Amino acid sequence: MTLLALKEDRPTPKAVYNWRVYTCAAIASFASCMIGYDSSFIGTTLALPSFTKEFDFASYTPGALALLQSNIVSVYQAGAFFGSLFAFATSYFLGRRRSLIAFSVVFIIGAAIMLAADGQRRGVDPIIAGRVLAGIGVGGASNMVPIYISELAPPAVRGRLVGIYELGWQIGGLVGFWINYGVNTTMAPTRSQWLIPFAVQLIPAGLLFLGSFWIPESPRWLFANGRREEAIKVLCWIRNLEPTDRYIVEEISYIDADLQRYAREVGKGFWKPFLSLKQPKVRWRFFLGGMLFLWQNGSGINAINYYSPTVFRSIGITGTNTGFLTTGIFGVVKMVLTIIWLLWLVDLVGRRRILFVGATGGSLCMWFIGAYIKIAGPGTTKTEEAKLTSGGIAAIFFFYLWTAFYTPSWNGTPWVINSEMFDQNTRSLGQASAAANNWFWNFIISRFTPQMFIKMEYGVYFFFASLMLLSVVFIYFFIPETKSIPLEAMDRLFAIKSVHNANKILMDELNFDRNPEREQSSLDEKDRVTQTENAV
Protein backbone atom coordinates (compact mmCIF):
# COMPACT_ATOMS: atom_id res chain seq x y z
CA MET A 1 0.00 0.00 0.00
CA THR A 2 1.47 3.37 -1.03
CA LEU A 3 1.50 6.45 1.14
CA LEU A 4 -1.42 8.11 -0.62
CA ALA A 5 -3.39 4.95 -1.45
CA LEU A 6 -7.16 5.33 -1.12
CA LYS A 7 -9.88 3.01 0.06
CA GLU A 8 -12.88 3.75 -2.16
CA ASP A 9 -16.51 2.95 -1.39
CA ARG A 10 -17.12 2.39 -5.14
CA PRO A 11 -15.19 2.68 -8.42
CA THR A 12 -14.22 6.35 -8.65
CA PRO A 13 -12.90 8.19 -11.73
CA LYS A 14 -9.50 9.77 -11.17
CA ALA A 15 -10.95 13.11 -12.27
CA VAL A 16 -12.88 13.27 -9.01
CA TYR A 17 -9.63 13.78 -7.06
CA ASN A 18 -8.89 17.09 -8.74
CA TRP A 19 -7.47 20.48 -7.77
CA ARG A 20 -10.90 22.07 -7.40
CA VAL A 21 -12.04 20.10 -4.38
CA TYR A 22 -8.65 20.55 -2.69
CA THR A 23 -8.61 24.28 -3.44
CA CYS A 24 -12.11 24.78 -2.04
CA ALA A 25 -11.09 22.93 1.12
CA ALA A 26 -7.92 25.02 1.42
CA ILE A 27 -9.75 28.33 1.01
CA ALA A 28 -12.39 27.37 3.57
CA SER A 29 -9.57 26.35 5.89
CA PHE A 30 -8.32 29.92 6.14
CA ALA A 31 -10.97 29.93 8.88
CA SER A 32 -8.96 27.39 10.82
CA CYS A 33 -5.79 29.44 10.28
CA MET A 34 -7.40 32.33 12.12
CA ILE A 35 -8.68 29.96 14.82
CA GLY A 36 -5.26 28.38 15.27
CA TYR A 37 -3.50 31.72 15.36
CA ASP A 38 -5.92 33.21 17.87
CA SER A 39 -5.64 30.14 20.07
CA SER A 40 -1.84 30.21 20.20
CA PHE A 41 -0.63 33.81 20.08
CA ILE A 42 -2.56 35.07 23.09
CA GLY A 43 -0.71 33.09 25.78
CA THR A 44 2.75 34.26 24.75
CA THR A 45 1.50 37.79 24.03
CA LEU A 46 0.33 38.08 27.63
CA ALA A 47 3.91 37.18 28.65
CA LEU A 48 5.61 39.79 26.42
CA PRO A 49 7.55 42.33 28.54
CA SER A 50 5.97 45.18 26.55
CA PHE A 51 2.45 43.90 27.26
CA THR A 52 3.02 43.21 30.95
CA LYS A 53 4.56 46.68 31.35
CA GLU A 54 1.84 48.49 29.36
CA PHE A 55 -0.93 47.00 31.47
CA ASP A 56 1.03 47.01 34.75
CA PHE A 57 0.83 43.29 35.50
CA ALA A 58 3.41 43.74 38.27
CA SER A 59 0.82 45.53 40.41
CA TYR A 60 -1.46 42.47 40.57
CA THR A 61 -1.35 39.72 43.15
CA PRO A 62 -0.78 36.21 41.68
CA GLY A 63 -4.45 35.35 42.13
CA ALA A 64 -5.70 38.61 40.61
CA LEU A 65 -3.30 38.31 37.67
CA ALA A 66 -4.40 34.73 37.03
CA LEU A 67 -8.02 35.92 37.00
CA LEU A 68 -7.28 38.77 34.58
CA GLN A 69 -5.34 36.52 32.22
CA SER A 70 -8.01 33.83 32.29
CA ASN A 71 -10.68 36.44 31.53
CA ILE A 72 -8.74 37.79 28.55
CA VAL A 73 -8.27 34.28 27.19
CA SER A 74 -11.64 32.72 28.02
CA VAL A 75 -14.03 35.39 26.70
CA TYR A 76 -12.88 34.26 23.26
CA GLN A 77 -14.11 30.73 23.94
CA ALA A 78 -17.36 32.07 25.39
CA GLY A 79 -17.97 34.02 22.18
CA ALA A 80 -17.06 30.97 20.12
CA PHE A 81 -19.61 28.89 22.02
CA PHE A 82 -22.42 31.22 21.00
CA GLY A 83 -21.01 31.68 17.49
CA SER A 84 -21.14 27.93 16.91
CA LEU A 85 -24.83 27.98 17.85
CA PHE A 86 -25.59 31.02 15.67
CA ALA A 87 -24.04 29.12 12.78
CA PHE A 88 -26.92 26.66 12.75
CA ALA A 89 -29.33 29.45 11.81
CA THR A 90 -27.01 31.08 9.28
CA SER A 91 -26.24 27.71 7.73
CA TYR A 92 -29.92 27.00 7.20
CA PHE A 93 -30.95 30.40 5.85
CA LEU A 94 -27.76 31.64 4.17
CA GLY A 95 -25.96 28.44 3.25
CA ARG A 96 -22.41 27.39 3.98
CA ARG A 97 -20.57 29.90 1.77
CA ARG A 98 -22.39 33.07 2.81
CA SER A 99 -22.14 32.01 6.44
CA LEU A 100 -18.35 31.93 6.08
CA ILE A 101 -18.44 35.45 4.65
CA ALA A 102 -20.58 36.70 7.54
CA PHE A 103 -18.46 35.15 10.27
CA SER A 104 -15.22 36.39 8.72
CA VAL A 105 -16.63 39.94 8.83
CA VAL A 106 -17.53 39.56 12.52
CA PHE A 107 -14.01 38.32 13.25
CA ILE A 108 -12.40 41.21 11.37
CA ILE A 109 -14.43 43.74 13.36
CA GLY A 110 -13.40 42.07 16.62
CA ALA A 111 -9.72 41.97 15.66
CA ALA A 112 -9.82 45.67 14.75
CA ILE A 113 -11.37 46.61 18.10
CA MET A 114 -8.52 44.88 19.97
CA LEU A 115 -6.03 47.28 18.41
CA ALA A 116 -7.62 50.16 20.33
CA ALA A 117 -6.40 48.88 23.72
CA ASP A 118 -3.80 50.84 25.66
CA GLY A 119 -2.50 51.06 29.19
CA GLN A 120 -3.39 54.71 29.72
CA ARG A 121 -7.09 55.24 29.00
CA ARG A 122 -8.92 52.19 27.74
CA GLY A 123 -7.00 49.42 29.46
CA VAL A 124 -7.66 45.84 28.35
CA ASP A 125 -11.40 46.42 27.79
CA PRO A 126 -11.10 46.68 23.96
CA ILE A 127 -9.12 43.42 23.96
CA ILE A 128 -11.83 41.67 25.95
CA ALA A 129 -14.66 43.11 23.81
CA GLY A 130 -12.82 42.35 20.58
CA ARG A 131 -12.06 38.80 21.65
CA VAL A 132 -15.76 38.20 22.28
CA LEU A 133 -16.55 39.21 18.68
CA ALA A 134 -13.55 37.30 17.33
CA GLY A 135 -14.79 34.30 19.28
CA ILE A 136 -18.23 34.55 17.68
CA GLY A 137 -16.54 34.61 14.28
CA VAL A 138 -14.33 31.60 14.89
CA GLY A 139 -17.14 29.70 16.61
CA GLY A 140 -19.35 30.04 13.57
CA ALA A 141 -16.50 29.18 11.22
CA SER A 142 -15.51 26.13 13.27
CA ASN A 143 -19.07 24.87 12.81
CA MET A 144 -19.30 25.66 9.12
CA VAL A 145 -16.00 24.59 7.59
CA PRO A 146 -16.03 20.86 8.49
CA ILE A 147 -19.62 20.58 7.19
CA TYR A 148 -18.76 22.41 3.99
CA ILE A 149 -15.68 20.33 3.27
CA SER A 150 -17.34 17.00 4.12
CA GLU A 151 -20.22 17.81 1.76
CA LEU A 152 -17.80 18.54 -1.08
CA ALA A 153 -15.47 15.61 -0.46
CA PRO A 154 -15.48 12.19 -2.16
CA PRO A 155 -15.69 9.52 0.60
CA ALA A 156 -12.18 8.14 0.00
CA VAL A 157 -10.52 11.50 0.73
CA ARG A 158 -13.08 13.00 3.09
CA GLY A 159 -10.84 12.53 6.12
CA ARG A 160 -7.91 14.00 4.22
CA LEU A 161 -9.88 17.04 3.06
CA VAL A 162 -11.42 17.75 6.45
CA GLY A 163 -7.87 17.25 7.70
CA ILE A 164 -6.83 20.30 5.66
CA TYR A 165 -8.98 22.23 8.12
CA GLU A 166 -6.87 20.80 10.94
CA LEU A 167 -3.67 21.57 8.99
CA GLY A 168 -4.79 25.18 8.65
CA TRP A 169 -5.33 25.26 12.40
CA GLN A 170 -1.75 24.08 12.95
CA ILE A 171 -0.28 26.55 10.44
CA GLY A 172 -2.07 29.39 12.20
CA GLY A 173 -0.93 28.01 15.53
CA LEU A 174 2.66 27.75 14.33
CA VAL A 175 2.67 31.42 13.32
CA GLY A 176 1.03 32.34 16.62
CA PHE A 177 3.61 30.44 18.66
CA TRP A 178 6.61 31.89 16.81
CA ILE A 179 5.51 35.48 16.26
CA ASN A 180 6.09 36.52 19.84
CA TYR A 181 9.52 34.89 19.86
CA GLY A 182 10.27 36.98 16.78
CA VAL A 183 9.04 40.32 18.11
CA ASN A 184 10.64 39.70 21.50
CA THR A 185 14.09 39.06 20.00
CA THR A 186 14.04 41.71 17.25
CA MET A 187 12.03 44.62 18.67
CA ALA A 188 12.29 46.93 21.65
CA PRO A 189 9.60 46.35 24.31
CA THR A 190 7.31 49.13 23.06
CA ARG A 191 3.60 49.30 22.28
CA SER A 192 4.28 48.25 18.67
CA GLN A 193 5.84 45.01 19.88
CA TRP A 194 2.59 43.64 21.31
CA LEU A 195 0.30 45.31 18.73
CA ILE A 196 1.85 43.34 15.85
CA PRO A 197 0.64 39.91 17.09
CA PHE A 198 -2.87 41.34 17.47
CA ALA A 199 -2.80 42.90 13.98
CA VAL A 200 -1.70 39.67 12.26
CA GLN A 201 -5.13 38.20 13.09
CA LEU A 202 -6.53 40.26 10.21
CA ILE A 203 -4.53 38.38 7.54
CA PRO A 204 -6.20 34.92 7.60
CA ALA A 205 -9.60 36.51 8.22
CA GLY A 206 -9.16 38.74 5.17
CA LEU A 207 -8.09 35.78 3.02
CA LEU A 208 -11.17 33.82 4.13
CA PHE A 209 -13.43 36.77 3.38
CA LEU A 210 -12.05 37.23 -0.14
CA GLY A 211 -11.77 33.51 -0.91
CA SER A 212 -15.37 32.83 0.12
CA PHE A 213 -16.58 34.86 -2.88
CA TRP A 214 -14.85 32.35 -5.19
CA ILE A 215 -15.75 28.97 -3.70
CA PRO A 216 -19.14 27.44 -4.66
CA GLU A 217 -22.01 26.68 -2.34
CA SER A 218 -22.29 23.12 -1.03
CA PRO A 219 -24.20 21.04 -3.60
CA ARG A 220 -25.92 19.09 -0.82
CA TRP A 221 -27.26 22.33 0.65
CA LEU A 222 -28.45 23.39 -2.81
CA PHE A 223 -30.25 20.06 -3.31
CA ALA A 224 -31.86 20.35 0.12
CA ASN A 225 -33.11 23.85 -0.71
CA GLY A 226 -34.67 22.99 -4.08
CA ARG A 227 -31.96 24.54 -6.27
CA ARG A 228 -31.44 21.34 -8.23
CA GLU A 229 -30.01 22.66 -11.50
CA GLU A 230 -27.47 24.79 -9.67
CA ALA A 231 -26.61 21.86 -7.41
CA ILE A 232 -25.92 19.55 -10.36
CA LYS A 233 -23.81 22.22 -12.04
CA VAL A 234 -21.73 22.74 -8.89
CA LEU A 235 -21.37 18.99 -8.30
CA CYS A 236 -20.14 18.42 -11.85
CA TRP A 237 -17.67 21.29 -11.52
CA ILE A 238 -16.28 19.97 -8.25
CA ARG A 239 -16.03 16.38 -9.53
CA ASN A 240 -14.73 17.50 -12.95
CA LEU A 241 -17.24 15.16 -14.63
CA GLU A 242 -20.16 15.48 -17.03
CA PRO A 243 -23.76 15.28 -15.72
CA THR A 244 -24.22 11.98 -17.57
CA ASP A 245 -21.22 10.29 -15.98
CA ARG A 246 -22.22 7.21 -13.97
CA TYR A 247 -20.45 8.50 -10.86
CA ILE A 248 -22.42 11.77 -10.94
CA VAL A 249 -25.69 9.96 -11.60
CA GLU A 250 -25.06 7.63 -8.66
CA GLU A 251 -24.07 10.46 -6.32
CA ILE A 252 -27.19 12.44 -7.20
CA SER A 253 -29.34 9.36 -6.61
CA TYR A 254 -27.74 8.82 -3.19
CA ILE A 255 -28.35 12.44 -2.20
CA ASP A 256 -31.93 12.31 -3.48
CA ALA A 257 -32.65 9.08 -1.62
CA ASP A 258 -31.17 10.49 1.57
CA LEU A 259 -33.21 13.70 1.31
CA GLN A 260 -36.43 11.84 0.52
CA ARG A 261 -35.98 9.44 3.41
CA TYR A 262 -35.40 12.23 5.89
CA ALA A 263 -38.26 14.28 4.49
CA ARG A 264 -40.45 11.32 5.47
CA GLU A 265 -38.82 10.56 8.81
CA VAL A 266 -37.91 14.04 10.04
CA GLY A 267 -39.40 16.58 7.66
CA LYS A 268 -37.99 19.79 6.23
CA GLY A 269 -37.74 23.17 7.89
CA PHE A 270 -35.66 25.11 10.39
CA TRP A 271 -37.25 23.54 13.48
CA LYS A 272 -37.63 19.99 12.15
CA PRO A 273 -34.11 18.87 13.08
CA PHE A 274 -34.91 19.78 16.69
CA LEU A 275 -37.90 17.44 16.52
CA SER A 276 -35.56 14.69 15.37
CA LEU A 277 -33.97 14.85 18.83
CA LYS A 278 -36.95 12.82 19.97
CA GLN A 279 -35.30 9.87 18.24
CA PRO A 280 -32.89 8.00 20.54
CA LYS A 281 -30.47 7.29 17.67
CA VAL A 282 -30.13 11.01 16.92
CA ARG A 283 -29.69 11.99 20.56
CA TRP A 284 -27.06 9.26 20.90
CA ARG A 285 -24.99 10.66 18.06
CA PHE A 286 -25.21 14.16 19.52
CA PHE A 287 -23.96 12.76 22.80
CA LEU A 288 -21.07 10.96 21.10
CA GLY A 289 -20.04 14.11 19.23
CA GLY A 290 -20.02 16.19 22.38
CA MET A 291 -18.09 13.60 24.35
CA LEU A 292 -15.34 13.46 21.74
CA PHE A 293 -14.61 17.11 22.46
CA LEU A 294 -14.74 16.58 26.20
CA TRP A 295 -12.00 13.95 25.84
CA GLN A 296 -10.07 16.12 23.39
CA ASN A 297 -9.98 19.07 25.78
CA GLY A 298 -9.42 16.68 28.68
CA SER A 299 -6.07 15.77 27.15
CA GLY A 300 -4.68 19.13 28.27
CA ILE A 301 -4.03 20.50 24.79
CA ASN A 302 -5.72 23.85 25.33
CA ALA A 303 -4.04 24.40 28.67
CA ILE A 304 -0.80 24.23 26.67
CA ASN A 305 -2.09 26.28 23.72
CA TYR A 306 -3.34 29.16 25.86
CA TYR A 307 -0.87 29.11 28.73
CA SER A 308 2.31 27.61 27.29
CA PRO A 309 4.64 29.89 29.33
CA THR A 310 2.92 28.70 32.53
CA VAL A 311 3.11 25.06 31.44
CA PHE A 312 6.81 25.20 30.55
CA ARG A 313 7.63 27.13 33.70
CA SER A 314 6.05 24.31 35.73
CA ILE A 315 8.51 21.88 34.11
CA GLY A 316 11.43 24.17 34.95
CA ILE A 317 11.94 26.21 31.77
CA THR A 318 12.64 29.81 32.77
CA GLY A 319 13.32 32.99 30.84
CA THR A 320 10.93 34.68 28.42
CA ASN A 321 12.82 33.85 25.22
CA THR A 322 13.53 30.27 26.31
CA GLY A 323 9.84 29.73 27.02
CA PHE A 324 8.87 31.27 23.67
CA LEU A 325 11.44 29.11 21.85
CA THR A 326 10.17 25.94 23.51
CA THR A 327 6.62 26.92 22.60
CA GLY A 328 7.65 27.55 19.00
CA ILE A 329 9.24 24.11 18.74
CA PHE A 330 5.99 22.68 20.11
CA GLY A 331 4.17 24.38 17.21
CA VAL A 332 6.60 22.94 14.64
CA VAL A 333 6.20 19.41 15.99
CA LYS A 334 2.42 19.75 15.90
CA MET A 335 2.38 20.92 12.29
CA VAL A 336 4.72 18.19 11.01
CA LEU A 337 2.69 15.50 12.74
CA THR A 338 -0.55 16.99 11.44
CA ILE A 339 0.77 16.60 7.88
CA ILE A 340 1.54 12.94 8.59
CA TRP A 341 -1.97 12.48 10.03
CA LEU A 342 -3.50 14.25 7.04
CA LEU A 343 -1.67 12.35 4.30
CA TRP A 344 -1.64 8.89 5.81
CA LEU A 345 -3.12 8.12 9.19
CA VAL A 346 -6.66 9.47 9.06
CA ASP A 347 -7.82 7.70 5.87
CA LEU A 348 -5.55 4.64 5.88
CA VAL A 349 -5.16 3.72 9.54
CA GLY A 350 -8.62 5.00 10.38
CA ARG A 351 -10.15 7.07 13.14
CA ARG A 352 -10.56 4.54 15.97
CA ARG A 353 -7.07 3.09 15.99
CA ILE A 354 -5.25 6.41 16.08
CA LEU A 355 -7.51 7.62 18.91
CA PHE A 356 -6.62 4.49 20.90
CA VAL A 357 -2.89 4.92 20.41
CA GLY A 358 -2.92 8.67 20.98
CA ALA A 359 -4.82 8.51 24.25
CA THR A 360 -2.83 5.59 25.68
CA GLY A 361 0.60 6.98 24.83
CA GLY A 362 -0.34 10.54 25.78
CA SER A 363 -1.61 9.43 29.17
CA LEU A 364 1.66 7.65 30.00
CA CYS A 365 3.61 10.81 29.13
CA MET A 366 1.42 12.97 31.37
CA TRP A 367 1.91 10.55 34.28
CA PHE A 368 5.70 10.85 33.91
CA ILE A 369 5.67 14.66 33.72
CA GLY A 370 3.45 14.93 36.79
CA ALA A 371 5.63 12.49 38.73
CA TYR A 372 8.77 14.46 37.84
CA ILE A 373 7.23 17.74 39.02
CA LYS A 374 6.03 16.07 42.24
CA ILE A 375 9.51 14.73 43.03
CA ALA A 376 11.76 17.54 41.76
CA GLY A 377 9.55 20.63 42.13
CA PRO A 378 11.25 22.52 39.27
CA GLY A 379 8.58 25.21 39.07
CA THR A 380 9.56 26.55 42.49
CA THR A 381 12.87 27.92 41.17
CA LYS A 382 12.73 31.71 40.89
CA THR A 383 15.96 32.51 39.06
CA GLU A 384 16.14 33.04 35.32
CA GLU A 385 19.46 31.18 35.12
CA ALA A 386 18.24 27.92 36.67
CA LYS A 387 19.70 24.89 34.90
CA LEU A 388 17.60 21.94 33.80
CA THR A 389 18.42 18.65 35.50
CA SER A 390 18.51 15.34 33.64
CA GLY A 391 15.02 14.72 35.00
CA GLY A 392 13.89 18.06 33.59
CA ILE A 393 15.32 17.20 30.19
CA ALA A 394 13.48 13.88 30.35
CA ALA A 395 10.26 15.73 31.26
CA ILE A 396 10.66 17.97 28.20
CA PHE A 397 11.28 14.88 26.08
CA PHE A 398 8.07 13.32 27.39
CA PHE A 399 6.23 16.57 26.74
CA TYR A 400 7.22 16.42 23.07
CA LEU A 401 6.48 12.68 23.04
CA TRP A 402 3.02 13.54 24.37
CA THR A 403 2.72 15.98 21.46
CA ALA A 404 3.69 13.16 19.08
CA PHE A 405 0.92 10.96 20.48
CA TYR A 406 -1.75 13.65 20.75
CA THR A 407 -1.38 15.61 17.50
CA PRO A 408 -1.90 12.85 14.90
CA SER A 409 -4.82 11.46 16.88
CA TRP A 410 -7.01 13.68 19.05
CA ASN A 411 -6.12 17.04 17.53
CA GLY A 412 -8.17 16.75 14.35
CA THR A 413 -9.94 13.39 14.37
CA PRO A 414 -12.92 14.48 16.53
CA TRP A 415 -13.66 17.17 13.93
CA VAL A 416 -13.51 14.60 11.13
CA ILE A 417 -15.88 12.19 12.89
CA ASN A 418 -18.34 14.95 13.76
CA SER A 419 -18.35 16.19 10.17
CA GLU A 420 -19.29 12.69 8.99
CA MET A 421 -21.73 11.08 11.36
CA PHE A 422 -24.85 13.25 11.08
CA ASP A 423 -27.46 12.89 8.33
CA GLN A 424 -28.43 15.70 5.96
CA ASN A 425 -31.33 17.00 8.04
CA THR A 426 -29.41 17.07 11.31
CA ARG A 427 -25.90 17.76 10.01
CA SER A 428 -25.96 21.51 10.62
CA LEU A 429 -27.56 21.12 14.05
CA GLY A 430 -25.23 18.24 14.90
CA GLN A 431 -22.14 20.16 13.89
CA ALA A 432 -23.40 23.19 15.83
CA SER A 433 -23.78 20.98 18.88
CA ALA A 434 -20.32 19.48 18.38
CA ALA A 435 -18.66 22.86 17.89
CA ALA A 436 -20.52 24.30 20.88
CA ASN A 437 -19.30 21.38 22.98
CA ASN A 438 -15.76 21.99 21.79
CA TRP A 439 -15.88 25.65 22.75
CA PHE A 440 -17.67 24.96 26.03
CA TRP A 441 -14.94 22.59 27.22
CA ASN A 442 -12.38 24.94 25.71
CA PHE A 443 -13.83 27.72 27.86
CA ILE A 444 -13.69 25.58 31.00
CA ILE A 445 -10.02 24.75 30.43
CA SER A 446 -8.99 28.29 29.49
CA ARG A 447 -10.93 29.84 32.36
CA PHE A 448 -9.53 27.67 35.13
CA THR A 449 -6.06 26.55 33.99
CA PRO A 450 -4.15 29.37 35.77
CA GLN A 451 -5.98 28.62 39.01
CA MET A 452 -5.45 24.88 38.54
CA PHE A 453 -1.68 25.34 38.30
CA ILE A 454 -1.70 27.48 41.45
CA LYS A 455 -3.80 25.01 43.47
CA MET A 456 -2.96 21.58 42.00
CA GLU A 457 0.61 21.98 40.69
CA TYR A 458 1.73 18.50 39.52
CA GLY A 459 -1.83 17.22 40.00
CA VAL A 460 -2.86 19.03 36.81
CA TYR A 461 -0.85 16.50 34.77
CA PHE A 462 -2.32 13.54 36.67
CA PHE A 463 -5.79 14.96 36.02
CA PHE A 464 -5.24 15.12 32.25
CA ALA A 465 -3.56 11.68 32.24
CA SER A 466 -6.60 10.12 33.92
CA LEU A 467 -9.02 11.66 31.43
CA MET A 468 -6.97 10.34 28.50
CA LEU A 469 -7.20 6.80 29.90
CA LEU A 470 -10.97 7.11 30.27
CA SER A 471 -11.23 8.19 26.63
CA VAL A 472 -9.71 4.85 25.52
CA VAL A 473 -12.58 2.97 27.13
CA PHE A 474 -15.13 5.34 25.61
CA ILE A 475 -13.78 4.97 22.06
CA TYR A 476 -13.63 1.18 22.25
CA PHE A 477 -17.24 0.72 23.29
CA PHE A 478 -19.02 3.58 21.54
CA ILE A 479 -17.27 5.00 18.44
CA PRO A 480 -17.36 2.93 15.20
CA GLU A 481 -14.80 3.38 12.45
CA THR A 482 -16.17 5.89 9.89
CA LYS A 483 -13.42 5.89 7.25
CA SER A 484 -14.57 5.33 3.64
CA ILE A 485 -18.26 5.19 4.62
CA PRO A 486 -20.54 7.39 2.43
CA LEU A 487 -22.37 10.08 4.38
CA GLU A 488 -25.67 8.55 3.28
CA ALA A 489 -24.76 5.24 4.97
CA MET A 490 -23.88 6.65 8.41
CA ASP A 491 -27.29 5.73 9.85
CA ARG A 492 -26.65 2.10 9.00
CA LEU A 493 -23.11 2.26 10.44
CA PHE A 494 -24.31 3.49 13.83
CA ALA A 495 -27.15 0.97 13.86
CA ILE A 496 -24.72 -1.98 13.79
CA LYS A 497 -24.37 -3.34 17.32
CA SER A 498 -20.83 -4.69 16.98
CA VAL A 499 -19.06 -1.33 17.21
CA HIS A 500 -15.52 -2.61 16.61
CA ASN A 501 -16.60 -4.54 13.47
CA ALA A 502 -19.21 -2.07 12.18
CA ASN A 503 -17.03 -0.60 9.43
CA LYS A 504 -16.10 -3.99 7.95
CA ILE A 505 -19.69 -5.23 8.09
CA LEU A 506 -21.03 -2.15 6.31
CA MET A 507 -18.27 -2.02 3.69
CA ASP A 508 -19.00 -5.66 2.83
CA GLU A 509 -22.67 -4.79 2.43
CA LEU A 510 -21.90 -1.79 0.22
CA ASN A 511 -19.47 -3.73 -1.97
CA PHE A 512 -21.99 -6.54 -2.39
CA ASP A 513 -24.77 -4.13 -3.36
CA ARG A 514 -22.57 -2.43 -5.97
CA ASN A 515 -21.23 -5.64 -7.54
CA PRO A 516 -23.99 -7.00 -9.76
CA GLU A 517 -21.74 -9.76 -11.10
CA ARG A 518 -21.18 -11.04 -7.58
CA GLU A 519 -24.90 -10.76 -6.87
CA GLN A 520 -25.75 -12.60 -10.10
CA SER A 521 -23.16 -15.26 -9.30
CA SER A 522 -24.79 -15.75 -5.93
CA LEU A 523 -28.21 -16.11 -7.57
CA ASP A 524 -26.82 -18.58 -10.13
CA GLU A 525 -25.31 -20.62 -7.30
CA LYS A 526 -28.68 -20.71 -5.55
CA ASP A 527 -30.32 -21.88 -8.80
CA ARG A 528 -27.76 -24.67 -9.20
CA VAL A 529 -28.35 -25.83 -5.63
CA THR A 530 -32.11 -25.81 -6.20
CA GLN A 531 -31.78 -27.78 -9.45
CA THR A 532 -29.53 -30.32 -7.74
CA GLU A 533 -31.99 -30.75 -4.91
CA ASN A 534 -34.85 -31.20 -7.39
CA ALA A 535 -32.88 -33.76 -9.36
CA VAL A 536 -32.22 -35.70 -6.20
Swiss-Prot record:
Spans within the Cytoplasmic topological domain: 1-26, 96-98, 153-160, 217-285, 350-352, 411-435, 480-536
Entry GO terms, CC: membrane
Family according to the record: Belongs to the major facilitator superfamily. Sugar transporter (TC 2.A.1.1) family.
GO biological process, any: quinate metabolic process
Compartments where located: Membrane
Gene: qa-y
Superkingdom: Eukaryota
GO molecular function, one term: carbohydrate:proton symporter activity
UniProt protein name: Quinate permease
Region named Disordered: 516-536
Cysteine disulfide partners in this protein: none
UniProt-listed PROSITE patterns: MFS, SUGAR_TRANSPORT_1, SUGAR_TRANSPORT_2
Membrane-spanning segments: 27-47, 75-95, 99-119, 132-152, 161-181, 196-216, 286-306, 328-349, 353-373, 390-410, 436-456, 459-479
Membrane topology: Multi-pass membrane protein
This protein's UniProt keywords: Glycoprotein, Membrane, Quinate metabolism, Transmembrane, Transmembrane helix, Transport
Glycosylation sites: N184
Biased composition regions of type Basic and acidic residues, renumbered to the chain: 516-530
Positions in the Extracellular compartment: 48-74, 120-131, 182-195, 307-327, 374-389, 457-458
Gene3D superfamilies: MFS general substrate transporter like domains
Organism: Neurospora africana
N-terminal signal peptide: none
CDD domains the record matches: MFS_HXT (cd17356)
